[in-house]
Design a protein with these regions (language model features):
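Pre-active-site segment of Zn-dependent metallo-hydrolases
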Residues: 1-28
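Active-site flanking residues adjacent to catalytic metal/cofactor-binding acidic residues
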Residues: 2, 32, 52-53, 128-131, ...
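Metallo-beta-lactamase
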Residues: 21, 26-37, 52-106, 112-181
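Conserved acidic residues
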Residues: 27, 48, 166
């Protein structure tokens, strides 16, 4: 399961409706970034193995540590940040070849360590690209999200996605065909 963005009850209903499975059947979870929108279901997936690209784990840890330092006097904020840090430390770093015909595809920019998954087949290349290509509108306009950590890096990653994939699974939309390749 990649970027489990729905609340657990809703995702469980979707999994059951579409594939006849429930959250307990999920064995692996991959996040394209540590963005809170990408991890809403994690509380229902404690039994699964969690993976995230190492640069994303490192950059998220630095960001949380920085916020902890600045929130030194606010115990409530420190407690919340501590929970985020505990959650982050539960992630493992995947191999570059996560599964057969599934490779990591780093797409830094939206966050410093954003990473997609490249699904290789004989006829098409599918890229789960997270928020590097957020929606159909972003793809059509050739733009990235305005809240990127580094817009220049995000745009470079966006261009790499366009060059390599036939089909995109964007971060906030349904599956999209690459207009240059279709």
């Amino acid at each position: 399961l990649v970027d489990p963005s729905l609340p657990p009850m809703i995702l469980e209903a979707r999994l059951n409706e579409r594939w006849g499975m429930d959250l307990s059947s999920v064995t692996h979870v991959f996040l394209t970034s540590f963005d809170p929108d990408r991890r809403r279901t994690l509380e229902g997936l404690g039994h699964a193995s969690w993976y995230m690209h190492e640069p994303e784990i490192q950059s998220a840890k630095v960001a949380i540590d920085d916020e902890l330092h600045r929130a030194d006097d606010d115990q409530e904020v420190c407690d919340i940040l501590g929970q985020h840090l505990d959650l982050l430390m539960k992630f493992d770093v995947p191999n570059d070849h996560l599964l057969p015909q599934v490779d990591l595809f780093p797409v830094p920019g939206y966050t410093p360590g954003s990473c997609g998954l490249l699904l290789l087949s004989a006829s098409k290349t599918v890229l789960i690209c997270g928020d590097t290509i957020a929606t159909q509108e972003h793809l059509d306009k050739g733009v990235v999200l305005s809240n990127c950590a580094c817009a220049e890096d995000a745009m470079e990653s966006f261009k790499e996605c366009i060059e390599i994939a036939d089909i995109f699974v964007p971060g906030r939309d349904n599956v999209l065909a690459n207009p240059i390749r279709s």
